[in-house]
């Protein structure tokens, strides 16, 4: 079930979650392949936040977009999976028919009103609504927006280098969801060092999950937030930073980036906006002994 989204305030910026999908019944043994330790759940079940697992102890995750409204601009951070996508090696996300644009409108945004689309990386569940299928052609969903993403991601996913076993879930994604906005002249890329954008944002390299992934920080009115991308897919990884998901392409670097992000935001008033956490998908990281813990807001 998709819940009514909260509206968050960071300085003079409002942030709203538009959820494309809420997914349950996900096996932790598979999702955290090679990392999952069932003893963690049994030992911590009574002190973990609610909403992380279903009644069968299977994971709950989400896919969606963060709508960011500043006094000057309407911005989307990541664009979920999209409808009608031809994903021959990822049938679970292929040919969807979901009311994402209707939910976006409920959040107060029409496609033509979007000024910028900021993409943390170019995986299937982050770029899908960049485009939609109109009369058999993929066209930009947000025709007046500039689509901004890491250059390293474009270079990799537009090349044969990405045609490998680890990247099967993303086959055909660049062609349907990224190339059309490139060809429309609507894109801007961020170099591998990251950098500031629109004065209030900063692209921060957090590679590992993908080759050029970047998290995006937001600072407004003396308050801070971090859009973490896929540094973590589920709150269990806050408690267990060494756990990778099955979708992390460069595993050791993914662990390094995850630990670095957790260290940077723990015990500071930085709200963390996740890409795939359940519930509100937002919260705070604090230290707990030698590790970390998570609380939703």
Cite the ranges covered by each PLM segment.
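Metallo-beta-lactamase
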Residues: 1-109, 113-125, 141-205, 223-229, 253-269
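Active-site metal-binding loops of divalent metal-dependent hydrolases
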Residues: 20-21, 79-82, 122, 152-153, ...
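Short beta-strand scaffold segments in enzyme catalytic cores
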Residues: 64-68, 213-218
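Cap/insert and terminal regions of metallo-dependent hydrolase folds
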Residues: 91-98, 102, 219-297
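Active-site glycine- and acidic-residue-rich loops that bind
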Residues: 127-129, 202-214
């Amino acid at each position: 079930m998709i819940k009514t989204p909260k509206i968050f305030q960071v300085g003079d910026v409002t942030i709203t979650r538009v959820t494309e999908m809420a997914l349950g019944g996900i096996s932790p043994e598979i999702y955290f392949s090679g990392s999952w330790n069932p003893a963690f759940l049994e030992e911590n079940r009574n002190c973990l936040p609610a909403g992380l697992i279903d009644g069968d102890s299977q994971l709950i995750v989400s896919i969606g977009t963060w709508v960011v409204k500043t006094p000057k601009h309407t911005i989307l951070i990541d664009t979920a999976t999209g409808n009608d996508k031809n994903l021959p090696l990822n049938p679970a996300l292929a040919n969807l028919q979901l009311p994402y644009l209707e939910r976006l409108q409920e959040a107060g945004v029409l496609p033509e009103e979007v000024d910028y689309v900021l993409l943390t990386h170019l995986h299937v569940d982050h770029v899908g609504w960049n485009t939609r299928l109109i009369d058999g052609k993929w066209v930009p969903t947000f025709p007046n927006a500039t689509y901004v993403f890491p250059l390293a991601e474009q270079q990799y996913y537009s090349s044969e280098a990405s045609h490998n076993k680890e990247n099967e879930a993303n086959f055909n994604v660049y062609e349907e969801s990224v190339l059309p906005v490139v060809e429309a002249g609507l894109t801007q890329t961020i170099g591998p060092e990251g950098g500031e954008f629109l004065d209030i944002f900063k692209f921060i390299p957090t590679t590992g999950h993908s080759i050029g992934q970047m998290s995006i920080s937001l600072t407004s009115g003396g308050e801070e937030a971090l859009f973490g991308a896929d540094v973590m897919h589920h709150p269990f990884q806050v408690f267990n930073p060494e756990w990778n998901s099955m979708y992390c392409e460069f595993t050791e670097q993914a662990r390094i980036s995850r630990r670095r992000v957790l260290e940077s935001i723990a015990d500071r008033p930085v709200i963390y906006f996740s890409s795939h956490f359940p519930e509100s998908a937002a919260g705070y990281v604090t230290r707990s002994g030698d590790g970390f813990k998570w609380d939703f807001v």
